[in-house]
Amino acid sequence: MPKIFTDEEREALRIKLMERGFELLKTQGYKRIRIEALALDCYIAKGTFYAFFESKSEFRHQIMLYERQRAKDALLTYTDEDGKLSAKGLYQYLRWLFDENPNVFAYLTPSEQQYFLNEWPSGYIEHEDTDHATMNMLCHMLRKPRTDARRECACNLMKMGAAALTVPNLFLHNAWDETLDLLTQQIVACLTEQEID
């Protein structure tokens, strides 16, 4: 990359490209994203885009990783001053996840999802150790975790919610919000003894 950007400017531009790319993915779908238009949107040349990302496919992977990190960072905003997560904080975070839906898969067509799964490194998408680590981290952050926490059930419920968000047209629209609310309450009940205030 030419030295026309400082390291800070380079990182800010990389983030801008990913955020704008995710917006386009949500509104237009993956196949309709045009690198030329995205670069123009961010006031750079198409060639400069490829100094950040080797290909459109790598760009999509980086968006996914960025959104996952953004979701992890958001979790910290729901903790108390001592870094602990109350039942209410966990509930609010999970609702943010479902409402914000930073899951790239939710915006891909079924054929794009399959293509993406086939080219992603083996074991990355479905990795049991990662699932266990995530649930252990959540329980460790909780103010009052259940001694008999049902981590695997909570993990599956979270994945069910994420999967449901990829096909919202299968569900009754009028009960969607209440359904997500019940799902979220059940996840919280699997992990903490505290009531949601």
Predicted regions and their residues:
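Short hydrophobic/aromatic patch on the recognition helix
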Residues: Y43-F53
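Amphipathic alpha-helical packing segments from all-alpha helical-bundle domains
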Residues: F116-N156, E178-D181
